[in-house]
């Protein structure tokens, strides 16, 4: 589904993107890197790579300015940190033959790069993602493996902003934008399911909005096969964000599309109300609440009074504590969301 550029500008997505872009380091001079040095961003002094540990911060000997030391892995220069992702650290990277080709490379923290559990987590995430990531609203897995002594996974670099940053921004998003993003997430979820997997980690931090205003889902660390989800074979590992995790995961019950629909419902609630359904204090007792089957507070009482009643009804059904009372398939939910999307100005 195409996104209208004008409405994108009206929503301030482009402004948020420009603010973020101003903070990003310029593209590297590949000739310098291939010759074994970088240029201090403050004084222009040469800093030789061989004199510094890779992926570390080095102080310039002339001006004491802090500079990041890149690392070459296969065909990519890891050039600047992007942050943490699951079990690894993620770096903005550039193809060594062409700095216009970008990627996000995930590697293990320096002190744990030989940890077998972390290695399997890093490679396992990329292996799973490679089976379903070829979709316009999913971050593509380019390649993964072992290069010299480094395990790595190369992903599509998303030039955008995380959804949690958008939710926290001063501008409230209109229903039509929220519904569009929900439909794009559903499209990605359907593709993942059709490929034999469940995503299982839907939260604002794992949804990027690219510079064109469209969804890109990231981080496949909790994805498991549909078969494993239905069998409950992963029940001993209660992983995920408590604010968005379906209650059936907490009690070790089977998961399916209705579980992802619950997580999307909690995400929709967060986007509409600009607060999570459960407070931080609630989270401390959330497991106990689900186990003893305490009744969930009425979502209608927690959403803004001027919220579209049909959207309230849809969200309430999505986050029903009882899986059988929710929408059972992405297609069923998608039909209702799309109907509201067409009606919404």
What role is predicted for each listed range?
Residues 144:
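Activation-segment/catalytic-loop signature of the eukaryotic protein kinase fold
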Residues 112-131:
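AlphaC helix of the eukaryotic protein kinase fold
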Residues 181-182:
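Activation segment signature within eukaryotic-like protein kinase domains
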Residues 260:
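Conserved catalytic-loop aspartate of Hanks-type protein kinases
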Residues 148-162, 166:
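Conserved short submotifs of the Hanks-type protein kinase catalytic core
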Residues 187-197:
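Protein kinase catalytic-loop region centered on the HRD/HxD motif
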């Amino acid at each position: 589904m195409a996104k209208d550029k004008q409405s994108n500008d009206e929503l301030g997505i482009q402004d948020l993107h420009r603010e973020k872009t101003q903070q990003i380091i310029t593209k590297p001079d590949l000739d310098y890197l291939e010759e074994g040095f970088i240029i201090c961003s403050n004084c222009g002094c040469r800093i030789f790579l061989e004199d510094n540990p890779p992926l570390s911060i080095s102080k310039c000997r002339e001006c004491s300015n802090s500079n990041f030391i890149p690392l070459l892995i296969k065909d990519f220069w890891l050039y600047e940190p992007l942050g943490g992702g699951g079990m690894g650290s993620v770096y903005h990277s550039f193809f060594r033959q062409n700095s216009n080709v970008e990627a996000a490379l995930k590697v293990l923290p320096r002190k744990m790069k030989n940890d077998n559990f972390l290695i399997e987590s890093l490679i396992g995430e990329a292996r799973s993602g490679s089976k379903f990531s070829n979709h316009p609203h999913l971050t593509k897995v380019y390649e993964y493996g072992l290069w010299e002594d480094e395990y790595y996974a190369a992903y599509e670099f998303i030039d955008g902003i995380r959804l949690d940053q958008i939710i926290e921004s001063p501008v409230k998003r209109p229903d039509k934008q929220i519904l569009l993003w929900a439909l794009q997430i559903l499209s990605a979820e359907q593709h993942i399911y059709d490929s034999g997997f469940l995503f299982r980690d839907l939260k604002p931090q794992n949804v990027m909005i690219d510079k064109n205003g469209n969804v890109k889902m990231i981080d496949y660390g909790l994805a498991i096969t549909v078969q494993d989800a239905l069998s409950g074979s992963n029940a001993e590992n209660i992983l995920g964000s408590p604010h968005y995790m379906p209650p059936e995961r907490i009690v070790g019950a089977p998961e399916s599309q209705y579980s992802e629909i619950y997580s999307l419902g909690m995400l929709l609630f967060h986007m509409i109300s600009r607060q999570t359904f459960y407070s931080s204090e609630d989270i401390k007792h959330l497991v106990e609440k689900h186990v003893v089957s305490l009744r969930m507070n009425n979502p209608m009482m927690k959403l803004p009074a001027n919220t579209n009643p049909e959207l309230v009804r849809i969200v309430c059904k999505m986050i029903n504590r009882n899986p059988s009372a929710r929408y059972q398939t992405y297609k069923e939910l998608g039909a209702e969301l799309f109907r509201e999307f067409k009606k919404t100005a």
